[in-house]
């Protein structure tokens, strides 16, 4: 069994648009204790099976976990097939890298199942062909990702704290958000301050340095996401931000009693609210 933890962004910046149409990004990310679970079983025939109970997630080649298995098998010339059982706990299209972390878990799991023993850096390079968050998710923990998300540099973990996630009942297409980017109008986060705060393990400096260049775009399309962020701060979160392209908003709190109060308060705004520890 392979755990596939969700990620949150502590900083997300978009630097420029490349000739291939994609954007170069700079993202500081860490993992939280909200995880999908992946079980892998070797099959004698050359096939890939996906088993999961979710009407929102495809179980064919559109699934990133399927694509990860196909790429791994091709790269390392694996003749056998594999059955991938996915227990979904991370919301879909939520800005928490649910699909990417599943793909990363498949790469790690197949590496062990078939005794390939490839180093994580090789798996991360493979994963970068699947999506911008997959390389980070191969490593997990805390890191800064640059370029298309394929240049990974590990960072110190944030101090222990609680994370409240709140997600409205909408899905946000990352592609749609990136298509609406006007670089000259973006509010760029101070990534350097986030990095300095992580080096010092300064919780409150991390909280006041959070920044996401995509927030204003998502807020314009879905004002309820902005309302959730404001509600999170008004309820007492030390810091709050939208993760990824949204719509999930997270709040950071050091003490459980306060986190519990904020969790209960946010239940009045949306049904999908979680209270978890930071993993980092």
From Swiss-Prot:
State the InterPro entries in the record.
Answer: GHMP_kinase_C_dom (IPR013750), GHMP_kinase_C_sf (IPR036554), GHMP_kinase_N_dom (IPR006204), IspE (IPR004424), Ribosomal_Su5_D2-typ_SF (IPR020568), Ribsml_uS5_D2-typ_fold_subgr (IPR014721)
Q: In which pathway does it act?
A: Isoprenoid biosynthesis; isopentenyl diphosphate biosynthesis via DXP pathway; isopentenyl diphosphate from 1-deoxy-D-xylulose 5-phosphate: step 3/6
Q: What is its EC number?
A: 2.7.1.148
Q: Which GO terms describe its biological process?
A: isopentenyl diphosphate biosynthetic process, methylerythritol 4-phosphate pathway; terpenoid biosynthetic process
Catalytic activity, per the record? 4-CDP-2-C-methyl-D-erythritol + ATP = 4-CDP-2-C-methyl-D-erythritol 2-phosphate + ADP + H(+)
Question: Keywords for this entry?
Answer: ATP-binding, Isoprene biosynthesis, Kinase, Nucleotide-binding, Transferase
Q: Which cysteines are joined by disulfide bonds?
A: none
One GO molecular-function entry: ATP binding
Where along the chain is the active site annotated? Answer: 7, 133
Q: Provide the residue positions that the database annotates as binding ATP.
A: 91-101
Report whether Iron-sulfur shows up as a keyword of the record. no
What enzyme class is recorded for this protein? transferase
Pfam families in the cross-refs: GHMP_kinases_C (PF08544), GHMP_kinases_N (PF00288)
Q: What does this protein do?
A: Catalyzes the phosphorylation of the position 2 hydroxy group of 4-diphosphocytidyl-2C-methyl-D-erythritol.
> Which family is this sequence assigned to?
Belongs to the GHMP kinase family. IspE subfamily.
UniProt protein name: 4-diphosphocytidyl-2-C-methyl-D-erythritol kinase
What phylogenetic lineage does the species belong to? Answer: Bacteria, Bacillati, Bacillota, Bacilli, Bacillales
């Amino acid at each position: 069994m392979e755990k596939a933890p969700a990620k949150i962004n502590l900083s997300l910046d978009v630097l420029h648009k490349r000739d291939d149409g994609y954007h170069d990004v700079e993202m500081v990310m860490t993992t939280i204790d909200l995880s999908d679970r992946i079980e892998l079983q070797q099959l004698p025939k050359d096939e890939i099976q996906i088993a999961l109970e979710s009407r929102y997630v495809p179980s064919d080649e559109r699934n990133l976990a399927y694509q990860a298995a196909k790429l791994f098998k091709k790269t390392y010339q694996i003749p056998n097939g594999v059955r991938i059982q996915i227990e979904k706990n991370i919301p879909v299209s939520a800005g928490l890298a649910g699909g990417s972390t599943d793909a990363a878990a498949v790469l790690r799991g197949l590496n062990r199942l078939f005794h390939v023993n490839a180093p994580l850096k090789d798996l991360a390079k493979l994963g970068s062909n699947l999506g911008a968050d997959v390389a980070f998710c191969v490593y997990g923990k805390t890191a800064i990702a640059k370029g298309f998300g394929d240049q990974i540099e590990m960072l110190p973990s944030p101090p222990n704290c609680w994370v409240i996630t709140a997600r409205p009942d909408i899905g946000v297409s990352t592609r749609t958000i990136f298509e609406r980017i006007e670089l000259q109008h973006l509010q760029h986060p101070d990534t350097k301050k986030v990095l300095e705060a992580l080096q010092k393990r300064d919780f409150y400096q991390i909280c006041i340095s959070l920044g996401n260049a995509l927030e204003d775009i998502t807020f314009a399309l879905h004002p309820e996401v902005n309302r959730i962020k404001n509600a999170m701060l008004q309820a007492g979160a030390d810091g709050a931000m939208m993760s990824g392209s949204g719509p999930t908003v997270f709040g950071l709190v050091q003490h459980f009693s306060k986190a519990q109060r904020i969790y209960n308060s946010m239940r009045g705004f949306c049904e999908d609210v979680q209270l978890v520890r930071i993993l980092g």
